[in-house]
A protein has these predicted regions:
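The alpha-helix within a helix-turn-helix
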Residues: 24, 35, 75-76
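A short, Lys/Arg-enriched amphipathic alpha-helix from helix-turn-helix/homeodomain DNA-binding modules
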Residues: 1-17, 26-27, 48-68
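Central "turn" residue of the DNA-binding helix-turn-helix
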Residues: 28, 79-80
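Residues within helix-turn-helix
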Residues: 21, 32, 69-73, 84, ...
Length: 114
């Protein structure tokens, strides 16, 4: 999506109410134009998958910078409505749980130190 850089910079997805309509408004286009620009997101459920992937990527960044954050804190900071939604979206985006992600980051950090 062409506005990925702006979305990642401004992080409108941290609002739990950020949905397809909010994304379209954020992009400053009509619904029709949005569907032409990104036809794969014509279905609101697929748009939500995209938004949740942005949230999961942001969660991974927070985890790398603040490994002491709780799952509840990260879910809240990233715009997920609850911790279960965060855990599910994270696993969907990365194929591993946030805990496994942190463990692998710690392992990589240890290897770099040796």
């Amino acid at each position: 999506m062409r506005s990925d850089a702006r979305v990642n910079k401004e992080k409108p997805f941290i609002d739990p109410d950020f949905d397809q309509d909010a994304l379209i408004k954020f992009m400053g286009v009509s619904h029709e134009t949005f569907c032409k620009l990104v036809p794969r997101y014509k279905d609101p459920a697929r748009t939500l998958d995209y938004i949740n992937s942005l949230r999961a990527e942001y969660a991974a960044k927070i985890l790398m910078e603040h490994s002491d954050c709780s799952a509840d804190d990260i879910a809240s900071k990233c715009g997920f409505r609850n911790t279960a939604a965060y855990l599910s979206a994270f696993k969907f985006a990365f194929g591993i749980t946030p805990t496994d992600f942190m463990n692998s980051m710690k392992q990589m950090f240890k290897k770099k130190q040796n």
